[in-house]
Protein backbone atom coordinates (compact mmCIF):
# COMPACT_ATOMS: atom_id res chain seq x y z
CA UNK A 1 0.00 0.00 0.00
CA UNK A 2 1.35 3.46 -0.91
CA UNK A 3 -0.46 5.30 1.89
CA UNK A 4 -1.37 4.91 5.54
CA UNK A 5 -0.49 7.18 8.41
CA UNK A 6 -2.44 6.37 11.57
CA UNK A 7 0.60 7.09 13.75
CA UNK A 8 3.03 9.98 14.07
CA UNK A 9 6.40 8.46 14.97
CA UNK A 10 7.13 5.37 12.85
CA UNK A 11 9.61 5.83 9.97
CA UNK A 12 8.47 8.54 7.57
CA UNK A 13 8.28 6.94 4.12
CA UNK A 14 6.31 9.40 1.99
CA UNK A 15 5.57 13.06 2.63
CA UNK A 16 3.86 15.86 0.70
CA UNK A 17 5.28 19.38 0.94
CA UNK A 18 4.85 22.64 -0.95
CA UNK A 19 7.91 24.66 -1.85
CA UNK A 20 7.77 28.43 -1.16
CA UNK A 21 8.50 29.06 -4.83
CA UNK A 22 4.97 27.71 -5.39
CA UNK A 23 3.28 28.81 -2.15
CA UNK A 24 4.89 32.28 -1.90
CA UNK A 25 5.45 32.88 -5.65
CA UNK A 26 7.43 36.12 -5.29
CA UNK A 27 8.30 38.90 -2.85
CA UNK A 28 5.44 41.12 -4.04
CA UNK A 29 2.89 38.42 -3.22
CA UNK A 30 4.52 37.85 0.16
CA UNK A 31 4.43 41.57 0.95
CA UNK A 32 0.73 41.78 0.13
CA UNK A 33 -0.54 38.60 1.77
CA UNK A 34 1.52 38.41 4.96
CA UNK A 35 -0.39 41.25 6.63
CA UNK A 36 -3.72 39.88 5.43
CA UNK A 37 -2.86 36.52 7.02
CA UNK A 38 -1.73 38.01 10.37
CA UNK A 39 1.91 37.00 9.93
CA UNK A 40 4.20 38.33 12.65
CA UNK A 41 6.58 39.64 9.98
CA UNK A 42 7.09 39.72 6.23
CA UNK A 43 9.09 36.70 5.02
CA UNK A 44 12.11 37.34 2.84
CA UNK A 45 11.35 35.38 -0.31
CA UNK A 46 14.91 34.56 -1.36
CA UNK A 47 15.93 33.49 2.15
CA UNK A 48 12.76 31.41 2.43
CA UNK A 49 13.76 29.54 -0.73
CA UNK A 50 17.23 28.78 0.65
CA UNK A 51 15.99 27.80 4.12
CA UNK A 52 13.36 25.53 2.62
CA UNK A 53 15.98 23.69 0.60
CA UNK A 54 17.79 22.91 3.86
CA UNK A 55 14.54 21.71 5.41
CA UNK A 56 13.80 19.53 2.37
CA UNK A 57 17.29 18.06 2.57
CA UNK A 58 16.64 17.00 6.17
CA UNK A 59 13.49 15.18 5.07
CA UNK A 60 15.28 13.44 2.22
CA UNK A 61 18.28 12.47 4.35
CA UNK A 62 15.89 10.79 6.79
CA UNK A 63 14.94 8.41 3.98
CA UNK A 64 11.57 9.94 3.13
CA UNK A 65 10.26 10.03 -0.43
CA UNK A 66 9.42 13.73 -0.80
CA UNK A 67 6.50 14.75 -3.03
CA UNK A 68 5.79 18.35 -4.05
CA UNK A 69 2.32 19.89 -4.21
CA UNK A 70 2.12 22.07 -7.34
CA UNK A 71 1.43 25.78 -7.26
CA UNK A 72 -2.16 26.94 -7.61
CA UNK A 73 -3.45 30.46 -8.24
CA UNK A 74 -6.35 29.94 -5.83
CA UNK A 75 -4.10 29.44 -2.79
CA UNK A 76 -2.27 31.85 -0.48
CA UNK A 77 1.00 31.87 1.47
CA UNK A 78 -0.39 29.51 4.10
CA UNK A 79 -0.59 26.71 1.54
CA UNK A 80 3.06 26.03 2.42
CA UNK A 81 1.64 24.39 5.56
CA UNK A 82 0.49 21.16 3.95
CA UNK A 83 -0.35 19.38 7.20
CA UNK A 84 -3.68 21.15 7.72
CA UNK A 85 -5.87 20.60 4.61
CA UNK A 86 -6.18 16.82 4.92
CA UNK A 87 -5.68 13.80 7.16
CA UNK A 88 -4.37 10.47 5.93
CA UNK A 89 -6.09 7.40 7.34
CA UNK A 90 -5.50 3.77 6.47
CA UNK A 91 -8.63 4.03 4.33
CA UNK A 92 -7.54 7.05 2.32
CA UNK A 93 -7.39 10.83 2.55
CA UNK A 94 -9.95 12.83 4.51
CA UNK A 95 -10.27 16.36 3.13
CA UNK A 96 -10.59 18.98 5.82
CA UNK A 97 -12.80 22.07 6.10
CA UNK A 98 -10.66 25.10 6.88
CA UNK A 99 -11.70 27.99 9.11
CA UNK A 100 -9.91 30.78 7.23
CA UNK A 101 -11.36 31.84 3.89
CA UNK A 102 -7.87 32.16 2.40
CA UNK A 103 -7.35 28.43 2.96
CA UNK A 104 -10.69 27.09 1.71
CA UNK A 105 -9.29 25.99 -1.65
CA UNK A 106 -6.38 24.02 -0.20
CA UNK A 107 -8.20 20.70 0.41
CA UNK A 108 -9.18 20.66 -3.27
CA UNK A 109 -5.55 20.96 -4.37
CA UNK A 110 -4.71 18.05 -2.06
CA UNK A 111 -7.54 16.00 -3.54
CA UNK A 112 -6.27 16.55 -7.09
CA UNK A 113 -2.71 15.58 -6.18
CA UNK A 114 -3.60 12.46 -4.23
CA UNK A 115 -5.91 11.27 -7.00
CA UNK A 116 -3.04 11.75 -9.46
CA UNK A 117 -0.92 9.25 -7.48
CA UNK A 118 -3.81 6.82 -6.92
CA UNK A 119 -4.47 7.50 -3.26
CA UNK A 120 -8.20 7.16 -2.54
CA UNK A 121 -10.29 9.92 -1.00
CA UNK A 122 -12.16 8.45 1.97
CA UNK A 123 -14.35 11.52 2.36
CA UNK A 124 -14.50 15.18 3.26
CA UNK A 125 -15.64 17.36 6.13
CA UNK A 126 -18.50 19.63 5.10
CA UNK A 127 -19.93 22.83 6.60
CA UNK A 128 -20.90 23.56 9.33
CA UNK A 129 -18.18 21.12 10.31
CA UNK A 130 -14.60 22.40 10.61
CA UNK A 131 -11.51 20.25 10.92
CA UNK A 132 -7.81 20.98 10.39
CA UNK A 133 -4.95 18.50 10.34
CA UNK A 134 -3.02 20.38 13.01
CA UNK A 135 -5.69 19.41 15.54
CA UNK A 136 -5.30 15.67 14.93
CA UNK A 137 -2.88 13.60 17.03
CA UNK A 138 -2.71 9.84 16.53
CA UNK A 139 -2.01 8.22 19.90
CA UNK A 140 -1.79 4.80 18.28
CA UNK A 141 -3.18 3.20 15.13
CA UNK A 142 -6.66 2.88 16.59
CA UNK A 143 -6.81 5.91 18.91
CA UNK A 144 -6.84 9.52 17.74
CA UNK A 145 -7.18 12.78 19.67
CA UNK A 146 -8.68 15.89 18.07
CA UNK A 147 -8.47 19.41 19.44
CA UNK A 148 -11.82 21.18 19.64
CA UNK A 149 -11.35 24.92 19.35
CA UNK A 150 -11.53 27.71 16.78
CA UNK A 151 -10.11 25.58 13.91
CA UNK A 152 -11.91 22.27 14.50
CA UNK A 153 -15.41 22.08 15.96
CA UNK A 154 -17.69 19.42 17.42
CA UNK A 155 -19.49 18.86 14.11
CA UNK A 156 -16.20 18.43 12.26
CA UNK A 157 -15.04 15.91 14.84
CA UNK A 158 -18.36 14.05 14.56
CA UNK A 159 -17.96 13.77 10.79
CA UNK A 160 -14.34 12.69 11.20
CA UNK A 161 -15.38 9.94 13.59
CA UNK A 162 -18.08 8.79 11.16
CA UNK A 163 -15.69 8.71 8.20
CA UNK A 164 -13.11 6.70 10.11
CA UNK A 165 -15.69 4.15 11.20
CA UNK A 166 -14.07 0.82 12.02
CA UNK A 167 -10.59 2.11 11.17
CA UNK A 168 -10.38 3.33 14.78
CA UNK A 169 -11.62 2.32 18.20
CA UNK A 170 -11.67 5.75 19.80
CA UNK A 171 -11.77 9.42 18.80
CA UNK A 172 -11.00 11.69 21.76
CA UNK A 173 -12.19 15.30 21.70
CA UNK A 174 -9.72 17.60 23.49
CA UNK A 175 -11.04 21.08 24.38
CA UNK A 176 -8.63 23.88 23.49
CA UNK A 177 -8.34 27.24 25.28
CA UNK A 178 -9.21 30.67 23.87
CA UNK A 179 -5.51 31.62 24.23
CA UNK A 180 -4.91 34.63 21.90
CA UNK A 181 -8.30 34.46 20.20
CA UNK A 182 -9.84 33.09 17.02
CA UNK A 183 -7.60 35.05 14.65
CA UNK A 184 -4.45 33.39 16.01
CA UNK A 185 -3.73 29.80 15.12
CA UNK A 186 -3.82 27.36 18.03
CA UNK A 187 -4.03 23.68 17.18
CA UNK A 188 -3.70 20.69 19.48
CA UNK A 189 -0.32 20.11 17.85
CA UNK A 190 0.74 23.57 19.00
CA UNK A 191 0.99 21.93 22.42
CA UNK A 192 1.80 18.26 21.70
CA UNK A 193 4.45 16.60 19.52
CA UNK A 194 4.85 12.81 19.63
CA UNK A 195 8.56 11.87 19.58
CA UNK A 196 8.18 8.14 20.22
CA UNK A 197 5.28 5.89 21.13
CA UNK A 198 6.12 6.48 24.80
CA UNK A 199 7.61 10.00 24.65
CA UNK A 200 5.80 13.28 23.86
CA UNK A 201 6.98 16.87 23.86
CA UNK A 202 4.29 19.06 25.47
CA UNK A 203 3.45 22.55 26.65
CA UNK A 204 1.33 21.54 29.62
CA UNK A 205 0.08 25.03 30.47
CA UNK A 206 -2.24 24.86 27.44
CA UNK A 207 -3.32 21.23 27.88
CA UNK A 208 -6.53 20.16 29.65
CA UNK A 209 -5.75 18.27 32.85
CA UNK A 210 -7.85 15.31 31.70
CA UNK A 211 -5.93 14.88 28.43
CA UNK A 212 -2.54 15.34 30.06
CA UNK A 213 -3.44 12.73 32.66
CA UNK A 214 -4.73 10.43 29.92
CA UNK A 215 -1.32 10.50 28.24
CA UNK A 216 0.46 9.79 31.52
CA UNK A 217 -1.90 6.91 32.29
CA UNK A 218 -0.99 5.38 28.92
CA UNK A 219 2.64 5.28 30.03
CA UNK A 220 3.76 8.21 27.88
CA UNK A 221 6.58 10.30 29.32
CA UNK A 222 5.99 14.03 28.89
CA UNK A 223 8.89 16.39 28.19
CA UNK A 224 8.02 19.99 29.02
CA UNK A 225 8.75 22.93 26.73
CA UNK A 226 9.78 25.99 28.80
CA UNK A 227 7.75 29.20 28.59
CA UNK A 228 10.58 31.07 26.88
CA UNK A 229 10.66 28.58 23.99
CA UNK A 230 6.94 28.29 23.33
CA UNK A 231 6.61 31.30 21.00
CA UNK A 232 9.74 30.18 19.14
CA UNK A 233 7.83 26.97 18.41
CA UNK A 234 9.92 24.68 20.59
CA UNK A 235 6.86 22.45 20.96
CA UNK A 236 6.44 21.90 17.21
CA UNK A 237 8.71 18.97 16.38
CA UNK A 238 8.45 16.41 13.58
CA UNK A 239 9.42 12.81 14.30
CA UNK A 240 10.92 11.15 11.22
CA UNK A 241 11.56 7.88 13.06
CA UNK A 242 11.12 7.03 16.75
CA UNK A 243 13.44 9.34 18.71
CA UNK A 244 14.77 11.11 15.64
CA UNK A 245 13.25 14.48 14.85
CA UNK A 246 13.41 17.83 13.07
CA UNK A 247 12.86 21.10 14.94
CA UNK A 248 13.41 24.83 14.51
CA UNK A 249 16.84 26.02 15.63
CA UNK A 250 17.03 28.42 18.56
CA UNK A 251 15.31 26.30 21.20
CA UNK A 252 18.34 25.04 23.18
CA UNK A 253 16.54 24.05 26.39
CA UNK A 254 13.96 21.96 24.56
CA UNK A 255 16.63 20.47 22.30
CA UNK A 256 18.72 19.57 25.35
CA UNK A 257 15.79 17.86 27.03
CA UNK A 258 15.17 15.81 23.91
CA UNK A 259 18.81 14.84 23.60
CA UNK A 260 18.88 13.80 27.26
CA UNK A 261 16.24 11.21 26.28
CA UNK A 262 18.55 9.89 23.52
CA UNK A 263 16.61 11.70 20.79
CA UNK A 264 18.60 12.61 17.68
CA UNK A 265 17.70 16.21 16.82
CA UNK A 266 18.19 17.94 13.47
CA UNK A 267 17.46 21.67 13.20
CA UNK A 268 16.74 24.20 10.47
CA UNK A 269 16.44 27.98 10.23
CA UNK A 270 12.72 28.67 10.56
CA UNK A 271 12.90 32.46 10.66
CA UNK A 272 11.14 32.92 7.31
CA UNK A 273 9.21 29.71 6.59
CA UNK A 274 8.04 28.91 10.12
CA UNK A 275 8.13 31.65 12.76
CA UNK A 276 6.55 34.47 10.75
CA UNK A 277 3.63 32.29 9.62
CA UNK A 278 3.36 30.26 12.85
CA UNK A 279 3.98 26.90 11.19
CA UNK A 280 6.72 24.56 12.35
CA UNK A 281 8.09 21.37 10.80
CA UNK A 282 4.93 19.36 11.46
CA UNK A 283 2.86 22.10 9.79
CA UNK A 284 5.17 22.15 6.75
CA UNK A 285 4.65 18.45 6.07
CA UNK A 286 1.80 16.09 5.22
CA UNK A 287 3.09 12.58 5.89
CA UNK A 288 1.05 10.07 3.92
CA UNK A 289 2.94 6.86 4.59
CA UNK A 290 4.70 5.73 7.74
CA UNK A 291 5.86 2.17 8.18
CA UNK A 292 6.98 -0.08 11.03
CA UNK A 293 9.01 -2.16 8.57
Where are these regions (language model features)?
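The feature marks the mature, well-folded catalytic cores of soluble enzymes
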Residues: 1-293
